[in-house]
Amino acid sequence: MARVSRQTPQQYSGRQAHPVDEVLPVAKLTLYGFQHVLAFYAGAVIVPIIVGNALGLSHEELVYLINADLLTCGVASIIQALGVWKIGARLPLVQGVTFTAVSPMIAIGLGAGGGTAGLLVVYGAVITAGIATFLFAPFFGKLVKYFPPVVIGTVLTIIGLTLIPQGLQDAAGGAKLIGHPGYGDPKNLAYALGTLLFILVVVRLGKPYLSSLAVLLGLVAGTAVAWLLGDADFGAVKDADWFGVSTPFHYGMPKFELFPIIAMVVVMLITMVETTGDVYAIGEVTRKKVDNATVANALRADGAATILGGVFNSFPYAAFAQNIGLVRMSKVMSRFVVVAAGGFMIVLGLLPKAGSVVAAIPHPVLGGAAIAMFGMVAAVGIQILGKVDLREERNALILAVSLAAALLPNAVAPFFERMPEDIRAVLNSGITLGSLTAVLLNLFFNVFTRRSTMEIDWDDIEGDEPEEAHGPLGAHEPAGAHRPAGPFPPQGAHAPQSPHAPQSPHAPQGPYTPQGPSTQQGHYDPQGTGNPQGPHGQQGPHWGAPGN
């Protein structure tokens, strides 16, 4: 994993704009903006496809979800990059739907009967969670210390493990084929495996930028092969409109139910940790000073985007890490490039015919790509846990009990069947149940007793390699998954020091370092490597997918 230079941010005179604030010529804005869209696209569309398929939506309804998602992604990215009042970090951050919300939204939607009726309950929870995020943004910095590596690593592992079954289900043919002879057909498995192998080959042999598009290229290649063999149906594309606008509350007024709201607020808490890490990471890459106000503005943008998502028939939003890596690789730091990318996404969100093409991707092809992306989320979580002292019984119990809680809904489907119907929205989501368990156990073991878990030095995990060796997110971090987020120190605070280490002006203490005596010395320094980590999962080495 490449390390970002650890120099003091360069000072710019009043006449010299910081590169982040530089307005490039239209041709360059167009080129670099489209580059961001390519790196982002696969991760942007896969969430509405997976959620829509799981809830049993029709092709037309799926197209609407995809277009609404892209439209909201564009608006959210523009708000984050340009800034409106105290909303938006004014940094080159691209916004996308977080993978963290996938499993809870499916559980909420199915618990409400599936279909568009289930979506109404999902949207009520999304809107409320967005409002909570917006209001809570200025105070979140004080809570980051309650998300130490043992919690972050456990949550990311849970996210990956609970999402992988969704990918496997699509690989076998999709939820609609369960109980039919076509489910698990060897041909379906061959398409899924072929797509997965294609992605792996692109990452292995492709140049950095090409590798950043591995998931997108895998989806295109797998769909093309399926079409040539007569297994992809694009008949609905010709009937789709060329132009269409997503309207607020398209499926009706949202329904606000307590336990779905609790589940979605938990999702947004995890997402806020991720966004905090993303903001410090992009500040490090661009040499732009980041402070608590910047983080609060970014979190408000997440909240505002999530509210918009619920109103315009989409989902919760957070920054996409693979685009941060793209900024590092291209050296183009202008936030107006992200504004251009947002414009492209808005245009794509107004083209139902383009959305219809995406909705026609065969389930097995989608499943092959999803396995890679979701598996990487779990891998990143395991990577973080590898730096936690699991010989310490408390840490081991946090991991063990949280994993057991998260696996209950999938491993034993009727486990909570006799619980009150309203509370099942929380209990039937492995991500929500497991994450709550991890946070509460950490409070019980390590906070109320004034003990803290060790901190992580990301350089120890990834190795210290030359920056030039990598593209978007480092050669060892496939994208497709929302990255692990963590408490990132502020710009310039690259390596929080151990209490027993000599103080150095080059490594000041960051305000987000967990407090209290540590059971083992170490450093939690994600952005010291130059690769943003966050709980949407790791947006992966060079793959275009996502997470956060």
Predicted regions and their residues:
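Membrane-embedded helical hairpins/re-entrant loop segments and their flanking transmembrane helices
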Residues: 26, 52-90, 263-335
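Juxtamembrane interface elements at the cytosolic ends of transmembrane helices
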Residues: 6-14, 44-48, 52, 194-205, ...
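Hydrophobic transmembrane alpha-helices of multi-pass solute/ion transporters
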Residues: 14-15, 19-23, 31, 198-201, ...
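Short, non-helical or kinked segments that cap or interrupt transmembrane helices
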Residues: 64, 87-101, 145-152, 210-217, ...
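Terminal cytosolic tails of multi-pass membrane transporters
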Residues: 430-494, 514, 532-548
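N-terminal signal-anchor module of multipass membrane proteins
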Residues: 2-92, 100-112
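Membrane-embedded alpha-helical modules
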Residues: 108-232, 342-454
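Hydrophobic, membrane-embedded alpha-helices of multi-pass small-molecule transporters
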Residues: 27-40, 44, 184-196, 213-214, ...
